[in-house]
Amino acid sequence: PEAAVSWYRQGAERGSVRSMYELGRCCQGGIGVAEDLKQALIWFHKSAEVGDADSLGLLGWSYEYGIGTEQDYARAVEYYQCAAEKGNASSMNNLAEMLANGRGGPRNFEQAMFWYQRAAEAGSVCALYNMGWHAEQAGRIAEALDCYRQAQQSGDEAAFWALGRFYEIGIGVEQDPKQAFALYQAGAEKGNVNCRCRLIRCYALGIGTPRDPDMARQLGRALLCEKLDPWDLEDYGCQPELEQLRQLMDTLET
């Protein structure tokens, strides 16, 4: 990594846009160099000034979450918009999320759906999942199910949780606890927090699998002791799932 950083630095100093971006990524992640979030932001700004879509997207991310700078939703929207207009799929999805949730400006659901669709067409699996979530909230269950299935088949970890809920309860499909358990288990193996919460519940209550309170306690303690990423906690449904898990663990520990 150190050698790569040296090459990136030389390239960046000569004006290579890609080198500026890669050097920023190294500074942001502490790869081959000491982590320096503010320096990462400087390099992203330099490459964004000449129109690099990836850098524009990462600037949006940095301002959305306050990484190396003060959190600023309005600026995040600006950078996501610029990157999205240059065809950056993840920025299209992130812009849609900001618009759908009214971050950085008034909520604009119509524009959000436009960018979700564009993002999905550009290959964003997250956008498929997000479209499914909003369709579910609006009561368009068949549409939600279709989006979730497409996202799950493409490997989106959150879609395993969404589909698992549908099979557990019987929403738009025939109720199938075993299928729900299998989906939660697969999503948990990918690290999805919501799936991990549901998997623990399955073991505790015997949903789709033999009841195993010891396994539930073991997995529950591990999850509740973990320091979770802030963006994991912002996933749709994550806070309610964690709250239900805490209540379940109180019951299991007594």
Predicted regions and their residues:
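Short helix-capping/linker turns of helical repeat alpha-solenoids
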Residues: 13-16, 29-31, 36, 49-52, ...
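TPR/TPR-like alpha-solenoid helical repeat scaffolds
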Residues: 198-201, 229-253
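Hydrophobic face of amphipathic alpha-helices that form TPR/SEL1-like repeat modules
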Residues: 20-29, 56-65, 94-101, 105, ...
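TPR/TPR-like alpha-solenoid repeats
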Residues: 11, 26, 47, 62, ...
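Ankyrin-repeat and related helical/solenoid repeat scaffolds used for protein-protein interactions
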Residues: 110, 157-228, 233
